Amino acid sequence: MNLNKWLLGIGICSLGFGLYMVFVKPHVDDYYLDHENAQAIENYQSKNVSAIPLDTPTDKSKMIGYIEIKDAHIKAPVYPGAATEKQLKHGLSLVEEDESVDEQNVSIAGHKAEGRHLQFADLYKVHMGSKVEFHTKGETRRYEIVSHRKVNPTNTSVLEEKVGKSQLTLITCDDYNPNKNKWMTRSIYVAKAV
């Protein structure tokens, strides 16, 4: 009899823990991530402009700015590249190791997670003409979304410099295939300086 009660107690605890992990924990994680991002952005904004580094920091944990896209409800810190799995845990990241915010084509990568409010998860909500603000180096750079396309994950042509106006290239994973447990394409959003 005691064994049955003990097993029932373990079963109920296991079920409760499983339900918490599936239904509650992602929301708690999102809450804390949003709070950390908001605090990082507030700290960045409160810095004296002269205290904001003009060069891309070599310390990968130091923000280089933050991006704001109102149509997609995105306001997230941006960190130096390269956009490795480890670096993307901090937040959005410049794609390449030696990339600078002063390049003609600044490429920024972010995670997309189904059912979670994380980095570029809501980027799909933008449309042609959506406004993008990149706050960096004590200034606000304004852009407008001009194109969206999907590419093969091995396509690096989206990172190339092009003659003309400055642009942001926003990159996130797309078309998740649960059978292969991988993202099949990359969504590329290009925003031109206005």
Annotated model-derived regions:
Residues 1-5:
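Positively charged n-region of N-terminal signal peptides that target proteins for export
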